[in-house]
Amino acid sequence: MIPILFFYIPGWCSSHNFYVTLVSKKYFMSLDFHPLSLADRSLVWKYTENAGRRNCDLSFANLYAWRMLYRTEVAEWGGFLVFRFYADGHLAYLMPVGEGDWCAILQALKEDACRLSHPLLLLGVCEDLMPQVEECMGEDCRVNANRDHADYIYLRESLALLSGKKLQAKRNHVNRFKALYPDYRYEELTDEWVPACLDLTRRWVESRQDEAEKRAVAAESEAIQRALAHREELDLRGGVLLVGEQVVAFTYGAPICRDTFDVCVEKADVEFEGAYTVINKEFVSRLPEQYKYVNREEDLGVEGLRKAKLSYQPEMLLMKYSVWSSCTVKAEIEECGLTPEQHLIKWQTRALWSLCFGDTEEFMKLYFTRKYTPERNSCLVRDGRVVAALQRLPYRMMFGGEDVSMAYVSGVCTQPECRGKGLMTELMLL
């Protein structure tokens, strides 16, 4: 007997249409995830070395350095390697790496997400893999391309030589740096230089003025500390740029696949004009020739960073798509009587709760399946997104000799960038 699953896509339209998928029993083999550790390096490389995938998300050095922030887990399934993590409170999966039945693995991910009461969110889906997604998921998904997360990929030789008219300005930067600081030198990154690199990172964090930006760079600082603490285990290559005995720039990276090297981090003291250009050139010129390409990662929508990355004349911009597919069962709508709008608000509130409190999946599932109702949830929506929410849980108590209906307020949460703007006061007065 073939089981029938019903999938609903929140927020697509105002209708209550359901999409029915017939699923083979083999798709229900569970994924055995475990927290990513240093011991997984050889496992990851086994899948990524010859996969031809060049996106920076698959660099083991990145995966490990950021694992605490994203709570990254890994599993093997049906010839594929899968990463599961949390992005801004949303359960998410990287597009699987490997060879096998694509429809089977995508269905397995959908079922895993459903088991954890989440819709399926796939990240890092490159354009060459979109045919597999479309074939297996059909209309049962939404696709979004975000230019801010496109990877900048360069020819190694181009960055090493800076030849040609278009890179004349870069050569000028290098020559000016050499003229200003004739006592400069480049050294391989070793344990000797790690304290100075961390000190430069600390000063970089402290230079930020905006509080939201400070939080973001503080997270990157922690990732840098974690990577440098395990430099050898992660197979990092790196370099430092010195003027006299002062470290004015450092960088490091690691392979993504056989022909592509990822520059994970590059930091420089901006007081030393041209330091960024010089550390980049010196480092890349020493990479093995097997690496035809160098990935210098995303610009994250930062205008200055985008301008700088484009100025090096990338060979390609690797677009990465996010794919969203809901796998909540039909009962969520029919039995609970939620409208599509209420359903979407529930998922967004759940994601915000997870982002703010970091509760376990067991607790989240318990609350949002047994206690949550639209009536108990007060939220503020801006541009289609829940930016603040709180829960009003009913209870009764004796007050002044009378049995009075009360509400206990809990789950008070606000998007980080919206804090300090009076949103919770507005909510409490609703």
What feature does the model see in each segment?
Residues 10, 16-17, 27, 98-190, ...:
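Acyl-donor-binding surface of acyltransferase catalytic domains
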Residues 24-56, 161-223, 327-394, 401-408:
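Short amphipathic alpha-helix that is part of the acyltransferase structural core
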